[in-house]
Amino acid sequence: MVDSHGLACNACGRCCNSAPTLSLRELFRHRDRFVGALTIGRVPKRRIGECWRAGHHGHALDADDVAACDALAERLLHRTGDAEREWIALTLQGYDYPSLGRCAALADDGRCSVHADKPSICGAVPLDPMLPDRLQSRVLAARRDDAAWLGADCIVETASARSFVESSFPVPLVTAGQVVDRAALDASRDALAFERAVWRDAVFASLIGGGQDVRHALSRLAPGGYLTVSIVPVLFAVASVSAHCRALSIGFIDAQRALIGMNIEAALARRHADDRPATRELRGFAQALERARHALAAMPTPAAEQTRHDAPRIEAWLDGRRDGDTLAA
């Protein structure tokens, strides 16, 4: 198993074939470009000796692998509390028509139109922030196969002298099993960890306390499966932090409703039958957002003593202020 890989990216845009996952901070920043949705995923607990698969590659997990998976899950995920001791992953996902086969941020020339301010996951890829560092070389081996299938050939084994891509010598990603430059990987994980206090813990508590129907729906998720639902529960959680956070949520709703309307209008003009399920879901999102806006606008302004003690930190984070950059570290 080769444990040293590099990235020889020539900005072809082939891997940008869907909308990214984002932190809420990033989604607020790019609210006019990405429709936000909440994804609820079931992540199985890893076990010693289990054959973990990444693409076509299999690997028998050892005790250190499992310990690393558990440590990362404790930080980023939520326990289901069932006998299997599995995990629930709550993330925010850009939602778009699958038939488009491209990220909404891609320009006509295939270049990223938000490159200078791209989501942290875009800087981390092809590494996977949801998996421990010790498995990243195996992630890259699998994604090397995917990149070759896409015709990109941008992930290379750095044992080779040079990339087959004409553009540049590959930038090292993993050398001898160790992540070389972990800034983007850490930024993505730190954002997930920080936003536990912003919305993820509250949304998870509401799911677990949502009654038997909700718990049954979660239990029916296959390991590795996920649900995509409206982002409204996230916005209610954030709006409860402070009056400023509520105003941010309302502004986000207005931008999202306008964006959804434009996306649906464009889909209707394309007249693709494959777009119909996504159109129905987007209309459902828009209706949920409209109801949420009315509810948030009717909420009384909380008194100063009712504002959360960590509200200034959360406001700085969601505003994208420079002093918020260090909060998640």
Segments from the language model and where they lie:
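Short loop/turn segments that flank or connect secondary-structure elements
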Residues: 1-329
